[in-house]
Amino acid sequence: MKQYLDLMKKVLEEGTPKADRTGTGTLSIFGHQMRFNLQDGFPLVTTKRCHLRSIIHELLWFLNGDTNIAYLKENNVSIWDEWADENGDLGPIYGKQWRAWGAADGRKIDQLSNVVNQLKQDPDSRRIIVSAWNVGELDQMALAPCHAFFQFYVADGKLSCQLYQRSCDVFLGLPFNIASYALLVHMMAQQCDLAVGDFVWTGGDTHLYSNHIDQAHLQLSREPRVLPKLVIKRKPDSLFDYHFDDFDIEGYDPHPGIKAPIAI
């Protein structure tokens, strides 16, 4: 994960001090890209321990079209707690947009099912895209989508994906985002009988919060370790039938975790 550490170093050295919605303050750069060859290992940060349970359960929650934190709470995942209302609702965030985007004529569009069908029937299409940025519903969302738009690409029997992330919390959020989309590529590839290719991450406002600076320096002092390997133990009938126990991460030997406050 040298790419990730190089980005963190770049933000520290070149970032512009900026105010932000949370009032915390950031060092920020605009426009950065990283490429991860998924054949080389699963891109899970090793210079601190990442909470893999949260990453997997959150993705399964998205895939189910869920926007209430009850499922997450049942599985001891607290990453969305700060944004939920008193009933646990978050409004029409990722899961709703991915699985039931509201069309003007009243239809509900299942973008992910459409992607699976496109990959199987027309893998050379340049329109294999999912968007969470629904302008008409942004004001109803507890948090506007940070990872907003992603596209799939097939070449030589390998499935690649590029994500555009309009806002990126480099220390806390980005390791989750990279691992989550890498996991999605593996799942999608399995469902479509493809090998995995690259995950390409593209960031807009890419920042370190002012209260994450010391933690970033600590992480940069650590040497990255060998990437782990993802094992999917069975092939379910559809993309939406995976369970938490279907996944093993072999050989994950990270440095200790580093605590940091969340900017809300």
Curated annotation (Swiss-Prot):
SUPFAM superfamilies xrefs: Thymidylate synthase/dCMP hydroxymethylase
EC numbers on record: 2.1.1.45
UniProt superkingdom: Bacteria
Catalytic residues (UniProt): 146 (nucleophile)
MF annotations from Gene Ontology: thymidylate synthase activity
Family of the protein in this entry: Belongs to the thymidylate synthase family. Bacterial-type ThyA subfamily.
Protein name in the entry: Thymidylate synthase
InterPro entries given in the database record: Thymidate_synth/dCMP_Mease, Thymidate_synth/dCMP_Mease_dom, Thymidate_synth/dCMP_Mease_sf, Thymidylate_synthase, Thymidylate_synthase_AS
Lineage, uppermost ranks: Bacteria, Pseudomonadati, Pseudomonadota, Gammaproteobacteria, Enterobacterales
Gene name of the encoded protein: thyA
Keywords attached to this entry: Cytoplasm, Methyltransferase, Nucleotide biosynthesis, Transferase
Provenance organism: Yersinia pestis
Single GO biological process annotation from the record: dTMP biosynthetic process
Catalyses which reaction(s): dUMP + (6R)-5,10-methylene-5,6,7,8-tetrahydrofolate = 7,8-dihydrofolate + dTMP
Subcellular location: Cytoplasm
Pathway: Pyrimidine metabolism; dTTP biosynthesis
